[in-house]
Regions:
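Transmembrane-helix motifs of polytopic, lipid-linked glycan transferases
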Residues: 25, 85, 89-110, 148, ...
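Membrane-interface transmembrane helices that cradle and orient dolichyl/undecaprenyl
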Residues: 107-110, 149-163, 190-191
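Aromatic-rich transmembrane-lumenal/periplasmic boundary elements in polytopic membrane proteins
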Residues: 38-51, 206-263, 407-424
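Transmembrane helical bundles and short interhelical boundary loops of multi-pass, membrane-embedded
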Residues: 202, 206, 210-211, 219-221, ...
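Short helix- or helix-capping micro-motifs
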Residues: 23-30, 119-124, 131, 151, ...
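Transmembrane-embedded, aromatic-rich helix segments that form part
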Residues: 143, 163-166, 178-192
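Extracytoplasmic catalytic/substrate-binding loops of multi-pass membrane glycan-assembly enzymes
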Residues: 37-50, 60-72, 82-85, 225-228
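Short acidic/glycine- and proline-prone juxtamembrane loop motifs at membrane-interface regions
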Residues: 42-43, 91, 128-141
Length: 434
C-alpha cells in the first residue's frame, strides 16, 4: 500500500493528490480545533446530550428519536467524563470517517483512485459536514452509517458480507427512522450481485439490528425492553413525528429551498470582548454546494441520453440489464442519484416540519457525484480540473473562520453571507436555542 501511495505521488496526478491531501488535513484540523468550545450546550445539543446522560443514569429517554445516536454520544461521556469534549467526540470521529467514505464511494463510481482523493478533499473542506462533526448532533452520524451501508453493499462479494451492510442500515435506522429510505438502494445493489436472490434476502437483517439497539436503550433506561415494548415505542415516536406540521420555527425550510440553501442553521455565535465573535454555521462550501446541483443535473442528463439511445436502437432490454448490474459509469451514477433522492423523497410528499439538516445524508452522496465529475474531467482537462480543485480549497479557506470558530469581525461574517437571507444563518442565535 505504501509503495502504491508513493507511486501515485510520482504520477501525472501528483499535484492534484498533493493538493487534496493538504485540503484533507486542513479539513480535519477545522473539525478538531477547539472541539470542546464552547463548554455549554449549543444548537439542538440539549436534545441529545441530556438524554445521553439519562441513559447513563438509567432514566427514561425523553427525546423523539431512537436510542443509538444518543448511546454513541453517551459512550465517550462514560469513558472520559461529562465534558463538552466528550459530548462531541463521537460525531467528530464519525465525521472524519465521512471524509473517507465519500472518497471511497467516489472511487467506485469513477473507477479511478484519483476520485478518492478528490472526494475526500471536497468532503473535508465543506462546512455542512464540518458543522455536524463539531456538534453533539445526530445527522453527521446518520450520514456516516448510511454511506457505510451503501459502500459495504457495493464491495460485498458474497451474501454474508452483504449482511453486514444490512446490519449497518438497521443501525442507521436506530439513529433516525429516515434511514429506512435506503432499503431500495441496497436492494438495487443486491440485485447486481451474482447470487442476487440470496443477497437480497439478507436485507431482512436490517430490521434485526434496529430492535437490538432499541432494546439496549430501553434496558439501560430501566424500561421494558422486549419486542412489544420496541414496537410500542416506535409507534409512539412515529406518531409524534407525524404530528410535527406546525411550521412555526424561523429556520424551517422546504426541500426545494435546500438547493440554494435559503436558511442555513446558525449553530453558534459567541461574542468576544474585543468586538469579534466565534461563529459556527452549517452553511456548506458554496462552491461545492452548487456543484452538487450541477453534478446531479449532469448525472440525470446522462441517464436520459442513455435511455433515448437505447430506445432508438431498440436495445432497452440490454440497457436495463446493464443498469441493474451497475455496469458502466451511467449505471453507477444512477445508483448514487438514487441514494441522493432517497432521503429527500419523503419530504416531497410530507407536510412535516423540515430543516436543511435533513438534507445532509443526501448531500454527502451529492458530493460523491461532484468528485466523480472531477475525475472524468481529469481525463481530458487535467489542468482545468486541478485549478478547479484549488479554487474549491481556496473558498474553503475563506469560509474556515465560520466553520472552525476562529475569531472574526461581524463585517467578516457578513461578507461571507453572500445572500441577505443567509445573515441569520451566520450571525444570529435562533430564539429557540437553549
Amino acid at each position: 500500500m505504501r509503495r502504491k501511495f508513493l507511486q501515485s505521488l510520482r504520477a501525472p496526478d501528483a499535484p492534484l493528490i498533493t493538493a487534496a491531501i493538504v485540503m484533507i488535513v486542513f479539513g480535519i484540523g477545522l473539525r478538531a480545533q477547539r472541539l470542546a468550545f464552547p463548554r455549554g450546550l449549543t444548537w439542538d445539543e440539549h436534545h441529545f446530550v441530556l438524554n445521553a446522560k439519562t441513559y447513563l443514569a438509567h432514566q427514561p429517554d425523553l427525546n423523539d428519536h431512537p436510542p443509538l445516536g444518543k448511546l454513541l454520544i453517551a459512550l465517550p461521556i462514560h469513558l472520559l467524563g461529562d465534558t463538552s469534549l466528550a459530548w462531541r467526540l463521537a460525531p467528530f470521529l464519525l465525521g472524519c470517517v465521512n471524509i473517507v467514505l465519500v472518497g471511497l464511494i467516489a472511487a467506485w463510481v469513477a473507477e479511478r483512485r484519483t476520485a478518492f482523493w478528490v472526494g475526500a478533499a471536497l468532503a473535508a473542506v465543506d462546512g455542512f459536514l464540518i458543522a455536524y462533526s463539531r456538534s453533539a448532533l445526530l445527522d453527521g452520524m446518520l450520514a456516516c452509517l448510511c454511506m457505510a451501508a451503501v459502500l459495504t453493499a457495493l464491495r460485498a462479494r458474497s451474501w454474508p458480507s452483504f449482511a453486514l451492510a444490512s446490519l449497518l442500515l438497521g443501525s442507521a435506522c436506530a439513529i433516525k427512522y429516515s434511514a429506512v429510505v435506503f432499503v431500495p438502494v441496497l436492494l438495487w445493489v443486491a440485485l447486481s450481485k451474482p447470487s442476487a436472490l440470496a443477497t437480497a434476502a439478507t436485507l431482512v437483517l436490517s430490521p434485526a439490528a434496529y430492535p437490538g439497539w432499541f432494546s439496549l436503550g430501553l434496558w439501560m433506561a430501566k424500561q421494558p425492553f422486549g419486542p412489544s415494548a420496541v414496537v410500542a415505542e416506535t409507534k409512539r415516536l412515529y406518531l409524534h413525528h407525524a404530528s410535527l406540521t406546525h411550521w412555526k420555527h424561523p429556520l424551517l425550510s422546504h426541500w426545494y429551498e435546500w438547493f440554494l440553501p435559503t436558511r442555513p442553521i446558525p449553530m453558534r455565535n459567541d461574542p468576544l470582548s474585543d468586538g469579534r465573535m466565534r461563529v459556527l454555521t452549517a452553511m456548506g462550501n458554496p462552491l461545492v454546494w452548487w456543484l452538487v446541483n450541477l453534478a446531479l443535473l449532469f448525472a440525470i442528463g446522462s441517464v436520459v441520453v442513455a435511455l433515448v439511445l437505447a430506445l432508438r436502437r431498440r436495445a432497452l432490454g440490454p440497457a436495463t440489464r446493464r443498469a441493474l448490474g451497475l455496469a458502466g459509469p451511467t449505471a453507477r451514477r444512477s445508483l448514487i442519484v438514487a441514494a441522493w433522492c432517497a432521503p429527500i423523497v419523503p419530504w416531497w410528499v410530507s407536510a412535516r416540519d423540515s430543516y436543511v439538516y435533513h438534507y445532509l445524508p443526501a448531500y454527502a452522496f451529492g458530493v460523491v457525484l461532484v468528485a466523480a465529475l472531477f475525475a472524468d474531467a481529469l481525463r481530458r482537462f487535467r489542468t482545468a480540473a486541478f485549478v478547479a480543485l484549488l479554487v474549491v480549497g481556496q473558498v474553503g479557506f475563506y469560509y474556515s473562520p465560520v466553520w472552525g470558530q476562529n475569531p472574526i469581525s461581524r463585517e467578516g461574517v457578513e461578507q461571507r453571507a453572500l445572500w441577505r437571507r443567509w445573515h441569520v444563518g451566520f450571525t444570529l442565535r435562533s430564539p429557540f436555542d437553549p
